[in-house]
């Protein structure tokens, strides 16, 4: 059960994550961090070529980890890049997906980010079932917010379509 205090810190919206006005957005990246399809490609296109140049200097990212760059041409000051698991149905997938959210939030806090937007990590071409991924996302974020109650953080789950938005809303 999610407390009312935590529920008030979480928002679900349908839209384009690259257009959100918040301190940081999370990029569901691939291991190279050099751009790709889906939200990753959209973020790279919107942020501009400077993002790719900075990402090259990061030398990739392991699954479940997170790295941070400037937001460049986005409204967001920062982009936090995390690599979700390619779904295979194992417990390791769930642990790595939870790590994506937890490590992104920890990195955001280290950089004084107080509002952060997440896409539905791993639910596109990486094949993670939406309902399962949403449960992990909401549970992990809620646990982090409870554990860091002293830190003012607003979390936005930015959904690509109406179905995803409905699934997230149902979990809150």
Predicted regions and their residues:
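Phosphate/ribose-phosphate-bearing ligand recognition and processing surfaces
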Residues: 87-172
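Glycine-/small-residue-enriched capping loops at alpha/beta junctions
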Residues: 1-94, 98-110
